[in-house]
Amino acid sequence: MGSKFFVILGSQLFNPKILKKNGCSEVYMAEDFGLCTYFKHHKLKLYLFLTGMREYRDELENESISVNYFELSSRKKGESYVDSLIKFLKKKNLSEINIFEIEDKAFEEEFLKALKAANVTVNIFQSPMFIFERNEFVSMAKGKKVYRMSSFYQKARKNLDILMDENGKPVGGKWSFDEDNRKKIPKNVEPPEMIVFKKSKYAEEIKKLIINNFDDHPGDLENTWFPVNRAGAEKQLDNFLKVRFENFGIYEDAMLEEKNFLFHSCISPFLNIGLLTPDKVIKKTLQYAEKNNVPMNSVEGFVRQIIGWREFIRGIYHEEGALQSKSNYWKHSKKLTSSWYDGTTGIDPLDDCIKTTLKDGYIHHIPRLMVISNIMNLCGVDPKEIYKWFMEMYIDSSDWVMVPNVFGMATYADGGMMSTKPYTCGSNYILKMSNYKKGDWCDTLDGLYWKFTEKNRKFYENNPRLALLTRSLDRLNPERKNHIFKKAEDFIKQNTI
């Protein structure tokens, strides 16, 4: 057993075995008003973090790791996390601490600067939250002016020898089975129910604390659908493998009205706070897939989410996040009205996705990308405003997740640093991938889509992959064009500032 003193953040709830392996015998943990309020985080996100931290305290103590834990009730509202930590270290006469890599760049900078000024030595350990080290991403992306997930993913598969045959070729003959993952869910296919987790002994206390301190944050606390400890997170993964994994691939991009989780694993919240780690998730997934003959499009699609997208996004964030977060390629400047926070915009699928988000603090990637952020972008909303909304509304949100996803993928605000084209769509795509009914909303969304295309005609004409769009725009019936453009203008007036 080592004797190292670790500072553990609320997003670093790693297996105690990892701490012990790194020589940890004692930790500092603190709930913090500043970290709870730097965005108006969804109430369920606060619940996940605060309950998860207290459950983790118990887990560490059961593993004979000494825990110095400060609950919110013992903290002064105006005092920062770092100031409080430095006071504690002085009191304990500690001049050296250990910590896992901090993913949030601004907080990392504040933390290291303050501790240096206080003459505290900080030893930084590689984060188990990711498979690759930060500098590995740099070497894999060396010399590139633009970044592409597909080339990163291929290198990752080769480096890790995952889904590779004996000749060094991808199993199944291709790197991605994404084309097989675009079916809508038929009426006779019922997605399985989510498992119900045992309520945490801290549940009621934390709910009261949130209502008393953060009642103006979005969302409600009714549907605590997720686990808040390691055993529960592992159970969630096991349940996905047993009842959802087989159909995950084929229906990965599908949407259903008033249904949320479908065939998705829903483990991103637990990966993003350390209750699960990607190395173990991949190992368990591949073992299960081999034993149970899971279809290749499901296996590859899930592996791509974990070792492709997730690692790629983190790498982009540390290399280019500072630049991305200042970018605004389309020069959008509009702000969101309250309708985006209560689901009353008047576009049916959008309102359904917002209401689901308020209820669950979660929705899978297609509604996030092709419904919510797509429509925000088509309306000319400032990417910083879109980023803020996503940070506030999801329990799996983090700066490292949302900066590349919003400024890169969702809005193309970075001008194509990590994607070849903006992800925009009209009503056709949404109808094709879902059971949403046709309605008045279709004209509004189509108007937004074609209006955006017309406004950015030069961009589309200069891109060989997209030039076809302007030709389709020019073929629009003038009467229909006027009608849908008017609907779009009315929508923008009513739902943006």
Predicted regions located by residue number:
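N-terminal beta-strand-loop-alpha-helix module at the start
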Residues: M1-L72
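Well-ordered alpha-helical segments embedded in enzymatic catalytic cores
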Residues: G52-E55, S80-S84, P349, C353
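A short acidic (Asp/Glu
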Residues: P16-L19, F39-H41, E79-V82, F107-L112, ...
